[in-house]
């Protein structure tokens, strides 16, 4: 029994460690890459969030003869959240505006991935900005959930 618990804890630690190193939140989507990206754009527009660009990486790769599974990136931002975060630690600006990657894995599963705000908090040694980090976490999770499910 102790051995089983130890193995389970070791596996859990490894998963948590890999998640922390990765710095990404990955949310499965029931829709295609294009439809998921369309849904994200629609949600952002409804919320009045600025969309700076939508990059179809797989399309660009195809233009130079490289086959790439569907991969799109949406770059967006809201100065009401980003500016207070930069005021706490200006170096976080290198990771802003926010980005959401919508991609298809080797098993044809579609994912929404974005930078974990807690990872950015650690990366930039952000202190005294808990309320802003929580708002960003909630906003990104809400967008991903709404875009990925019925």
Describe the role of every protein-language-model region.
Residues 36, 40, 57, 132, ...:
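Stable alpha-helical elements in mature extracytoplasmic
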Residues 1-4:
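Positively charged n-region of N-terminal signal peptides that target proteins for export
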Residues 6-10:
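Sec-dependent N-terminal signal peptides
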Residues 13-51, 55:
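Terminal, regulation- and interaction-focused segments at domain boundaries
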Residues 118-150:
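C-terminal partner/receptor-binding element of secreted or periplasmic proteins
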Residues 99-126:
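Beta-strand/loop substructures that line and gate deep hydrophobic ligand-binding cavities in soluble
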Residues 41, 45, 52, 56-98, ...:
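Compact, glycine-rich, soluble single-domain proteins
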